[in-house]
């Protein structure tokens, strides 16, 4: 996955560790994670929003050696921070439902976002960067699909919508998770 956590830490299969018990268990974890988010909180792409994600919403519990995600503290937020936090919370729910934890401490530590982490740097930096970053991360984790084609989408898929054809700094769009068919 990155220098701090290899794909082997998260996966023993080509598809990724988020689906060895079956695809249905992953999508159930994602739906459960989504139900724990609240409405509101504000949409803002700012230093404050980055700080809320990295320092208030995502914490490491040294006693349990597992992450703690405080979803209500991630406010304000923005599209990639909300999608990434949903991904992390869903991974946590999925992992806790397994007979024994599958996601290693090392992998969790790599997945937790850090304030000041640059786009393209580590899993959070991949997810936050414009371009295919979140798609690559979701694919490597086996955590669903990330794409643009509405006709192929199903609830729980990560999607890029309103994406421009520009490259680099001028590239823009919106990340979301399809919640249900039909809008």
Go through each PLM region and give its residues.
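...with weaker cross-activation on analogous glycine-rich loops/strands in unrelated enzymes
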Residues: 105-183
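Boundary at the C-terminal end of the N-terminal hydrophobic targeting segment
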Residues: 4-7
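N-terminal capping segments
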Residues: 10-129
């Amino acid at each position: 996955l990155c220098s701090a956590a290899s794909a082997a830490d998260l996966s023993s299969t080509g598809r990724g560790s988020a689906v060895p018990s079956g695809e249905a268990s992953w999508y159930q974890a994602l739906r459960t994670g989504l139900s724990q988010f609240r409405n509101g909180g504000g949409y803002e792409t700012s230093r404050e929003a980055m700080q809320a994600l990295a320092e208030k919403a995502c914490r490491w519990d040294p006693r349990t050696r597992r992450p703690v995600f405080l979803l209500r503290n991630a406010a304000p937020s923005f599209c990639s921070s909300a999608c990434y936090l949903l991904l992390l919370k869903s991974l946590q729910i999925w992992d806790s439902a397994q007979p024994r934890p599958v996601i290693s401490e090392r992998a969790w530590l790599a997945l937790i976002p850090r304030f000041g982490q640059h786009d393209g740097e580590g899993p959070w930096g991949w997810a936050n960067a414009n371009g295919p970053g979140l798609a690559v991360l979701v694919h490597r984790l086996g955590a669903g699909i990330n794409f643009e084609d509405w006709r192929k989408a199903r609830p729980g898929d990560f999607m890029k919508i309103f994406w421009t054809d520009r490259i680099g700094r001028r590239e823009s769009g919106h990340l979301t998770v399809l919640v249900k068919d039909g809008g």
